[in-house]
Amino acid sequence: MAKGKRKNPTNRNQDHSPSSERSTPTPPSPGHPNTTENLDPDLKTFLMMMIEDIKKDFHKSLKDLQESTAKELQALKEKQENTAKQVMEMNKTILELKGEVDTIKKTQSEATLEIETLGKRSGTIDASISNRIQEMEERISGAEDSIENIDTTVKENTKCKRILTQNIQVIQDTMRRPNLRIIGIDENEDFQLKGPANIFNKIIEENFPNIKKEMPMIIQEAYRTPNRLDQKRNSSRHIIIRTTNALNKDRILKAVREKGQVTYKGRPIRITPDFSPETMKARRAWTDVIQTLREHKCQPRLLYPAKLSITIDGETKVFHDKTKFTQYLSTNPALQRIITEKKQYKDGNHALEQPRK
């Protein structure tokens, strides 16, 4: 067919199929199988163009979502910085007011002493001195009220800062939800395999060949973090793999837990979820406790963002922080003894290592 004279696929269907408005396909006859090879070339081209347009729209929507989320995160960070500056300025004002109050009190004390001296000498109190004392007392009262108001404002700003920090943490964790963090891969492997993406594919082939057969390993982004290589850093930088969705990431993490030990070229490595720095710090605080509980078959699990879940005597308990966990230990002497002995053993080894430094 000549270029520019392509028939409309819709008109073609109207010419050759009276019931084209129905969506039910005609069952293929034995002699003419209904395959994509027998479709009209123009219809195939039209369908492929539609698929490409859908892909482009999807990627554009995803990019727009990431850009809007990044802008929102930047705005929250700027608001947090402004709040921190206000808190610092108010703290400075409080210090200045407190210094002024101390000066006034000192002046008042000196004036009182002067009045007492004059009273002893003359037996009378000068009216101007009484007015001065009254003025000082009023200034002190006003300064104390100002300090109280500023203290209230500082507390409110501190609370607002904490809420903003938590919101930023949630946004960062949401953006990182499809991510995987790979720990223990030497930097030189990037040059040998031409990038972290190929390293990840190599890990999947080596440890989880069935997963690669069952689902496509589509990687949106792969990079080392932090971006700049620090020559003084002893360990290699972590690799971040951004998958197409969180379901693929969760399936890989489940396979990692079931396998127990993941390797790369025979060497052990670690694959973990990717969280914000604040969330990672909170989760690391449970490391020693989880290791001890796992050794005593207490089935510990770390829930998002940093909650400890344990199963004892068939009952599952969840602790949001170490304070709650410590309170529970006071009601469970056996578990408290296990945790205490482990801590004492670790502290003893640390004390033995001190003279070697």
Curated annotation (Swiss-Prot):
This is LINE-1 retrotransposable element ORF1 protein. Residues 278-339 are annotated as: C-terminal domain (CTD). Residues 179-274 are annotated as: RNA recognition motif (RRM) domain. Pfam families: Tnp_22_dsRBD, Transposase_22. Keywords: Coiled coil, Cytoplasm, Nucleotide-binding, Nucleus, Ubl conjugation. GO terms for cellular component: cytoplasm; cytoplasmic ribonucleoprotein granule; cytoplasmic stress granule; nucleolus; ribonucleoprotein complex. The gene is Lire1. The coiled coil domain mediates homotrimerization. PANTHER family: L1 TRANSPOSABLE ELEMENT-RELATED. It comes from Mus musculus. GO terms for molecular function: nucleotide binding; single-stranded RNA binding. GO terms for biological process: retrotransposition. Residues 59-156 form a coiled coil.
